[in-house]
Structure formats: C-alpha cells, structure tokens
C-alpha cells in the first residue's frame, strides 16, 4: 500500500473517506485506557497531527501504548469522519508497525518549553509546534521569493561566498585562510604575507552579493541573488546574527523609484503568499506568539507605503516632542526607536525614507546633486523598523573613484567593479532584504535566533 501524507488527508479529505490508507510519523501524544487508545501522530508534512484510534484487537496493542513520545510508527487503517469531535476525522487503525523506538529521556515532552531552552537543542526543536511552524513558513517564504522574481523575468544568479572585496566598506568580515596559524608567513614589515595563502591574497566570507549581482544586471538587465551572507559584528542582540540570508535584486535602467516600487511589491507578495499557503501556521502564530499579527500584516499588504526624505524625517522627529534615548539631529543614522516612531505614531504604516546623508551610507550609492546626500532608501515597517535597504548605484566613474578613496578602500580591489563604468554603463538600482528580518515580521518571532535553523552568533557555533 502506498503511504499517504497527513497533509493530503487534510487538504483532500473527501478523497480518503472510508478508504484504507497507510501513514507514517512520530508520536506526539498517547492517551490510553484498558481496551483502546488515542495516538496523535505527526509525519512532518503538515502542521496539524492526525489522531489514530486503536483497540486491543491490534496484535501489538500493549507494546504500542507503552511507547515513549517521538517513537516512529507506520499505521494501516481507515479514515473515518468525526463531525461531532474536535478533529474532523481520525484513522481507525488495523495494523501498527514500530519503525523506531525513542528514549524516555526525549527532552520535548508535552509541557511547554521556553524559546531559550529550545535554542540549546536546535537539532530537536523543529519537532516542537512553534519551530515546526517557523521553518515551514521559512520554506514557503523562500519559494515565494523565487516565484516573485521568476514571474517578472529576473535571472537568478549565484554570487561568490568567498570574496576579496568588502561591499559595505565596514571591515567586519570573517577572514578565510589555510595558513598555519602557528607559523604565519610575514612580510619584511612584519605584516602577514597573504601571497602565500591559498588564493594568493587576503580573502573573506561575503557580506553581500550586491557588487557581483551588479555585473550580471549589466548583462541580463534584471537579476537577483538569494543566499547566505556573513558579518563579523560583535552584536549579541535579538536582531543580529553572524550568518544570515539576503535577497538582493539589481535592475539596470532603473532609478530609486523603481527600486522602491519593486521592494514594496515584493514585501506584499511574500506576506500574501505565506498567508495563503500556511493558514494553520499563521493562525498558530496569531494565537500564541503575537495576537496582533494578522492586524499588523493586513495593514502592510493593504497600505500604500509612504515616502519621505531623511531631512523630512529628522524634522518630524525633532518637532514631535517625543523623548528618545538617542537625540535626533541631521547627520545621525536613524535608530530603531526613531524608525518605529515614524511608522507607528506618525504614519501608522510602512514608509520609505530616502536621500540619506552620504557620510552614513555605502560608497556605491549615487551621490545627489546637493553633494550632501545619496539616492538611498530604507523601508521601515511598524513593529520592527528597517527591513529593506537599497539605492540607485553610482554609475559615474569619477564620482565612484572619489567615494572609494573617501572610504579609505583600496581601488585595486575594485578594479573590475570600476571597469563596468567604462563599457556601456547605465543608471541602475538595487536593494537588500534580510530574509530573517521579514520572517521575524511575518511570524511575530522576536529573536533572529528563532527563525534560522542553526543560528551563528558571537560565542555560539553549535550544531
């Protein structure tokens, strides 16, 4: 008999009524009396469990009812409708086979566990209700990203994880080396001789695929990359991780407005797709994680995102009369408290803040005519703050060279990026959307460690 997924039983119940089926899964709970028992079985294909009813006519009944939680079973039986019960159907078992026993020391018992505790058993936490929902939503959201861009004829490109350049110019990168750390080759001035290293130069884990994606956009027009990025920031906060995933589109013949239009459409698309494809998981989050979740998400998808300049934002904040931990003045990098005040108290919806001071933005962002600001825009959303950052890219060779020098970067490391400006350069724009950031927003989870399967943070690289 072909095995049936529990998801199919829920999505196509009519097809299986009074039919003999076989399912497999792990025991979530067992309730028994002398002559019959109820098993909640989960096979990983669906958020909900299926109830299996067995009686003492089952050959191994006494053995089965003594099994610990998380033991795995195969069940042959008949699907029976139960209109007057909590669940709409159940499986009347005819035969049950033990696939694998579980230790009685299995840590995920029926009681509720804290998120902090579950992080210590990251190899087992996907079996809990919360993380079953989180990681299924992560999968669905990732598919939505690809679906959105493929429907718009963007080309999916893979950018290097090992790089010799620093996209952000921040220097917070993980270094890669195969050199013997007990016998590092040195130059005459006692600096490290990277010419003796594997790649013959200093290399790092990428902080962004943007620069490489730009090269592809100037061949294919519209491209996107979606992959892991790494930041060696010693930031032990709920919003930062050393390894995370970024969605980074780049669009040729596109100005700042085009980036903002695309980013707004993408965010709404991902949220709507998850709401449609994961209704059970989203209902769980709204009930147990954030009771205002549906209201917040519906506000996002039904709003036309606002657009204000950085200068206007500073003016609004200064005139608000609100007390902020970080004082507001022109030239500062807006903090989360400022971003949330704008989105929650002033506009009550997502907004783009544009035209930031060039001193606080990356070297590749196009300098505006005022010489003080760049054509950059951050998307701020209620409850979180920034989730998207992007800009029109600097296409003028002389200006880009000047900006690289201002940042104290080595122009030779960017020779190929500069050369793009010599061969049919055009205006182009792009942005980065932190995948974990939008997952936190969609699920209501408040810590980035809880939306990535095996989080990498300062002092922690388990599993």
Curated annotation (Swiss-Prot):
* Subcellular location(s) of the protein: Cytoplasm
Which GO biological process annotations does it have? asparaginyl-tRNA aminoacylation
Q: Which InterPro entries match?
A: Aa-tRNA-synt_II, aa-tRNA-synth_II, aa-tRNA-synth_II/BPL/LPL, Asn-tRNA-ligase, Asp/Asn-tRNA-synth_IIb, NA-bd_OB-fold, NA-bd_OB_tRNA
Molecular function GO terms recorded: asparagine-tRNA ligase activity; ATP binding; catalytic activity, acting on a protein; nucleic acid binding; transferase activity
Q: Does this UniProt record's set of keywords contain Transcription?
A: no
EC no. given is 6.1.1.22
Q: Name one GO cellular component term.
A: cytoplasm
In terms of SUPFAM superfamilies, this protein maps to: Class II aaRS and biotin synthetases, Nucleic acid-binding proteins
Q: Could you tell me the keywords of this UniProt record?
A: Aminoacyl-tRNA synthetase, ATP-binding, Cytoplasm, Ligase, Nucleotide-binding, Protein biosynthesis
Superkingdom field? Bacteria
Q: Name the CDD domains for this protein.
A: AsxRS_core (cd00776), EcAsnRS_like_N (cd04318)
Chemical reaction(s) catalysed: tRNA(Asn) + L-asparagine + ATP = L-asparaginyl-tRNA(Asn) + AMP + diphosphate + H(+)
> What is the protein's quaternary organization?
Homodimer.
Q: Which family does it belong to?
A: Belongs to the class-II aminoacyl-tRNA synthetase family.
What is the protein name stated in its UniProt record?
A: Asparagine--tRNA ligase
The organism of origin for this protein: Clostridium kluyveri (strain ATCC 8527 / DSM 555 / NBRC 12016 / NCIMB 10680 / K1)
